[in-house]
Each structure stands twice: as C-alpha cells, then as structure tokens.
Amino acid sequence: MTTVASLSLLPHLLIKPSFRCCSRKGVGRYGGIKVYAVLGDDGADYAKNNAWEALFHVDDPGPRVPIAKGKFLDVNQALEVVRFDIQYCDWRARQDLLTIMVLHNKVVEVLNPLAREFKSIGTLRKELAELQEELAKAHNQVHLSETRVSSALDKLAQMETLVNDRLLQDGGSSASTAECTSLAPSTSSASRVVNKKPPRRSLNVSGPVQPYNPSLKNFWYPVAFSSDLKDDTMVPIDCFEEQWVIFRGKDGRPGCVMNTCAHRACPLHLGSVNEGRIQCPYHGWEYSTDGKCEKMPSTKMLNVRIRSLPCFEQEGMVWIWPGNDPPKSTIPSLLPPSGFTIHAEIVMELPVEHGLLLDNLLDLAHAPFTHTSTFAKGWSVPSLVKFLTPSSGLQGYWDPYPIDMEFRPPCMVLSTIGISKPGKLEGKSTKQCSTHLHQLHICLPSSRNKTRLLYRMSLDFAPWIKHVPFMHILWSHFAEKVLNEDLRLVLGQQERMINGANVWNWPVSYDKLGIRYRLWRDAIERGVDRLPFSNQSESGS
C-alpha cells in the first residue's frame, strides 16, 4: 500500500504528529542521531520491527553550518546552509509521519473489539485520554513544523535573490555562478523579501536603445523563408539599420545586395528582376547577386558595384552574414523534429526592439495573464512556475507546463508544446503528451525600434490540416492576435525603458532564460573571450 493510500485511511483527527521517542546515537551519513525505537507508555517496543519505521527512517542531519573562509558567506556556502535546513525539515516531516503511524496503531489496538473484552470501561477511558493528550502534543508539533517550513521558505526566497544578484554581478561568465543559479529553488514566498533592503542590481536595461554593437553582426541570420522568394520576386529587409534586398540570380541561388541604386539612391526593390538581375525602376541599371552592375541603358558602361552580403539557402530558409569574415562552419538545422509537418510560415514587421521581443518570447509565466483570449484561455494560474535548465545551458523546460524551450543565438527561440487537453497544459511533461506543437521564432534586429519576426509552426498530428483551403489565413490571423496581446505590453515597456525605466529591475526564478539571454548578449557586446552558457553561443555557430 502506498503512503498516500495509507494516509487516506487514517481518521482526520489523527493527522497531527507527535510521539515520545527513545533514541541512541548511531552512525549516520551526517553523524547525527538515528531513531531506533518508539516506546509506548508501558515501555513496549512499537517501532523496532515496525514496517513504518523502516519506511520513514532517516538520519537526523543535525544543525550544521559550513565554515566561512572570509568575512561573509559566499553564495555556495549560503546555499549549503539552506540545504541543511531543508534536510532537517525533511527529517522532521518523516518523524511526524512516523508518529501518525504509531498513533494509528494505538487507536486500532484500543478500539479492537477483542481487546475491549478484557478491559474495563475505566481502562479504556484512561487509554483514550492518554491518546488525546498525545494528539494535543502532535497538534503543537504540527504548528512547530509549519513554522520551520515557513522559515525555510523565507531563506529560500532570500537565497534566490542572493543568487540572482551574484549572477548579475558576475555577468554570467563564471561557471560556478551559473551552477548556483540552477540550484536556487523558486518559491511563492519571494514576495516576502520586498520589505528587506533590495540588493544592488547590475543588469540594467534602461534608457534609449543604443546603436548595435558590431559584434552582434558576426552571426548567420535567417531573414526569409524560401517559399516567399520566387524567381521573379524581391524581398526587402532591414538589418541592423541598413536596407537590403534579396532576390534569386540566374542560377536560382539567392543573393543579398544593398537596397540602394549606385546611380541616384533609388530603392531597388521598387523595380523588378530581369534574367537573374535586379533592375532599378529609375533608369534601368541592373545588378547581379554579388552587387556588380551589369547593365546601364542609354550610357557608357562603367565599373560600378553596390555592397552585397554573403547569402545562402538551407532547409527552406535564406540566411545572410551582416558582419565581417563569415566562418566556414555549417549552420545548425532549424527544421522541426522528425515526424512534424510545417503548417505555417509567417513574417511580420513589429515596432519593438528585438531584445524586448526576445525577452517576451523567453517568458511563459505571463501567458495566463496576457493571452486570456487566445492560446492560454482557461489556463489556471500555478502557485509556482519554474524554468528548469542545466547550469550552463540556454535550453530547458517549464514546470508545470509541458513546454520545452531553447534560446539559440543570435536571435532564435525554439519551443515544443505538449498538447494533452484543449485549454489545459498542466500535469504532464512534454514527452508524456502524445501530440505536440513546435514553434520557431526568429527576431531579426531591423533597427533599434523595429524587428522582423519570422514564425514557423509545425504539428506532429493531423497533417491533412495543411491542405484545408485558406488555412494559412486562419493561422496568420491567430498568430497576429497572439502577438497583439504581447505588443500592447512590450510597446509600453519600450516607451518606459526609453524614458529611463529598467525592464529587468527585479528578476525572479522564472526569468532564468531571459536573464541568460541578456547575459549572453552583454558578453557578446563586451567582446569577452569565453561566452557564457555552453558552446552553442560561439560566434557564427
């Protein structure tokens, strides 16, 4: 019989633990006190061979505080203090549960019809009175345990604040700090620390958006879906506050050139594609995919060239390298996992800085409050939301939601959502769900106040939906509706940020992935030799 099932058989009155125990020193893992027996009033050994005692036995961890080598405890030592507190609470809870079992056995014995035949009413009253006294003690013990748990939660909340502060101060470059972050538990008691003096914060995202650091350009950026680039079409894009246009050359391969004619600075995308060359609509000058002007009607041919960027196509996506000296390394795949079918590819131009949009996409805790008319309609508000991730990673999974998420530098967010029941996501992990939705968000930094968003949605079920007429219009409408729910908030953030407000003023546990993105970006802009959070953050990978 399981513990839960056993407890369900106990009278409600008895679930208030306490007992008198006789203990002797034993050799435990922590050198504490090992409980060997529980004695009744008559000295009978109830627990020496009791299955309950064997099940819930645990060493007393005892009060232990790590020795500080300096004037103050560092983060690791502080976490050790909390860990020992948690171990003691666990030991105390097991002892309380053992008390419940012992009292249960006593009640069964007192009320046993066979035993009552050999006892007088006075004896039964006396035994019941003694049990009532023990229950009163158990009631007091429960309150004491609740106080201990509350104190432990307060310490956990303070440790969370301490770890976040240390993580922000260290800039994410220290592996030990990152490890501390993964160990920092998240509790609903975080609000209890607001009356304490707030620690100094070093993650400051406030003020007008500054010009982009050139280091951010040294990555491959996906800028368009292949399906949007026909042989006779052009795709104008902005990237890092420069205007470019993408088109296919004579060989069918995509090219990216400056969207400005060398002659009179006319936008080239207003023209047309003629035999694999982009033609200016003003005077008909034509440029190849490498930027060379190959045709000048009505004048003598001159050696003219406009800027071009390295550009290639992979797995239905067009990529460019806006920085210097592109590497020869291959680009990781952005395709959905095996078994998924792509149902929608949508492009939007949004009036927000791309970092703020990434902050939003890397945060799921806002969903039941923000997306109440779309995908999160009907979601309950969990008592605790956590993002569980390796100490040095940019990926993990949300608890209690069945959602896996990854930030992939420089600007991609990939997520897999397990679908169990419509309108309900809690209760299962992603792997436990039989059907899934896979999402890819690409946030291309168009300018300091504009983002080009590429969105791809895939399903591992119902592939026939893709062939339903006008289904792409429905997907686009739904995606736009979801984004509008976010935009009204992110635009407000952006306005206040420009006026001096810090959009990362008080990070909490479920902000972990967003914090790591910001620390990664800060490291890129500072030009550190070793980027934080795994090898996938290497430039150009």
Swiss-Prot record:
Expressed in leaves and germinating seedlings, but not in sheaths and roots. It is found in: Plastid, Chloroplast membrane; Plastid, Chloroplast thylakoid membrane. GO terms for cellular component: chloroplast membrane; chloroplast thylakoid membrane; cytoplasm. Its EC number is 1.14.13.122. GO terms for molecular function: 2 iron, 2 sulfur cluster binding; chlorophyllide a oxygenase activity; iron ion binding; oxidoreductase activity. Induction: Down-regulated by treatment with H(2)O(2). Its main location: plastid. Residues 220-320 form the Rieske domain. Fe cation binds at D359, D363, H366, H371. Keywords: 2Fe-2S, Chlorophyll biosynthesis, Chloroplast, Coiled coil, Iron, Iron-sulfur, Membrane, Metal-binding, NADP, Oxidoreductase, Plastid, Thylakoid, Transit peptide. Gene3D superfamilies: Naphthalene 1,2-dioxygenase Alpha Subunit, Chain A, domain 1, Rieske [2Fe-2S] iron-sulphur domain. CDD domains: Rieske_RO_Alpha_Cao. [2Fe-2S] cluster binds at C261, H263, C280, H283. It catalyses: chlorophyllide a + 2 NADPH + 2 O2 + 2 H(+) = chlorophyllide b + 2 NADP(+) + 3 H2O. Consists of three domains A, B and C. The C-terminal C domain possesses catalytic function while the N-terminal A domain confers protein instability in response to chlorophyll b accumulation. This is Chlorophyllide a oxygenase, chloroplastic. It comes from Oryza sativa subsp. japonica (Rice).
